[in-house]
Amino acid sequence: MNRIMIVDLVNDLRNKNLEAEEYIERTYEKIGKYDKYINAFITIRSKEEVLKEVKESINKGGKLAGVLIAIKDNISTEGIRTTCASKMLEDYIPPYDATVIEKLKKEGAVIIGKTNMDEFAMGSTTETSYFGPTRNPWDLERTPGGSSGGSGAALAAGYVELALGSDTGGSIRAPAAYNAIFGLKPSYGTVSRFGLVAYANSLEQIGPMARNAEDLGLLFSIIAGPDERDATTINLNLNFELKERSVKNVRIGVLSDILEMSEKPVSGVIKDVVNKLSSEGALIEDTKLGNAEYALPAYYIIAMSEASSNLARYDGVRYGYSKYMEGNWREVYAKNRGEAFGMEVKRRILLGSFILSAGYYEEFYLKALKVRNLIKKNLDELFKKYDILLSPTMPILPPKIGEVINDPVRMYAMDLNTVIANLAAIPALSMPVGFYSDLPIGLQLMGKYLSDIYLINISSFIERNITKLYNLTASVKI
């Protein structure tokens, strides 16, 4: 366990306490040794090109000068392949950078590569990728969570200190929990989605992933902020400042209805953390979300409906996979899409189209929107009583590769604890709090809208004073 932070790394590179060549050589050596087993990256940039950019960045300066960062492969990067882990976009190279990438480059970050993910971010285990599954560095027989599993695994393996993911229903927080790292699903509208390949617009956010709370906050403050190219962003200054917050008198509601639905090894670790928070002076109460059992079906109805609409643009003609160009447009459309989309993506498109069809729109979609509003109202009431809501991030330990991929209902149920924050547009953070049989367990902290930085500071207190778990690197057993 190492206390070095990004600010220390930037200073070491600038002062030549760490030479750029050594930094790059060490990183690529580790990737070369382990990633044939982990499969965290879809695309890795050449060592020479990255070293050149790192040196230039160190000379220019910036909050992230010379720091390598891994980017989830559904975020547009100019000149770097962006596949969404799909055959449909296997060779797509964007002509522009996403807003978050522009902001990172401005502060000197250097992209090392694009990370593996569930195809079009549809999945909870990073097994639906066209490029093969990503494996968990803590146990190569198990999944790293999804859909941002490649970013989580790259951090856990120690390839990089920072990564970006996207979170539609838990896709940052699940890999954070399963890889013993920190991940934040920001408040909706705090981070621009311009350049994010859309899955479900009303639910998803780009967010930071890091190996400790301080770095998480720094990365969030860099990517957050308004963007005229994304009308959903809000005009708000979210500069992060690490504050040694105590949890004394912090009102914490433990979501007992969610906690009790978790596996015993998971709930046991979480209850131990809750007891320690209480001994530090936190005001702990058991509470219930109310209507929690409806959150998951409402989420999937909304997400699949938006997915079927968003993915209609991949017609096999304008861009993307276009092997079949003869016959009428229906044949071209069906053949190209049928061959280029994976099974899980097809399933969600079909279900979404069904939900939005005549006769079912009111029965399913409109009712799901009503449930969404009900959950928002329930949370508004809870946040009048509590500063933070606490639960396990994931209800189960990391499943083995192949264990849930062919059981969609079981895979969807993995998102039980995380979809709530997406439905309500509130921030939610996952942090490592313990292990069971050497498998990481994550704690989820949810706060009221725009309390992102408050959550990060609370997580910093917990990591420093209670769990002492930060900057963890898995000992990869190959």
UniProtKB/Swiss-Prot annotation:
Pfam families: Amidase. Keywords: ATP-binding, Ligase, Nucleotide-binding, Protein biosynthesis. Its EC number is 6.3.5.7. InterPro entries: Amidase, Amidase_CS, Amidase_dom, AS_sf, GatA. PROSITE patterns: AMIDASES. The active site is at 72 (charge relay system), 147 (charge relay system), 171 (acyl-ester intermediate). GO terms for biological process: translation. It comes from the Archaea. Heterotrimer of A, B and C subunits. NCBIfam families: gatA. Allows the formation of correctly charged Gln-tRNA(Gln) through the transamidation of misacylated Glu-tRNA(Gln) in organisms which lack glutaminyl-tRNA synthetase. The reaction takes place in the presence of glutamine and ATP through an activated gamma-phospho-Glu-tRNA(Gln). Belongs to the amidase family. GatA subfamily. This is Glutamyl-tRNA(Gln) amidotransferase subunit A. The gene is gatA-2.
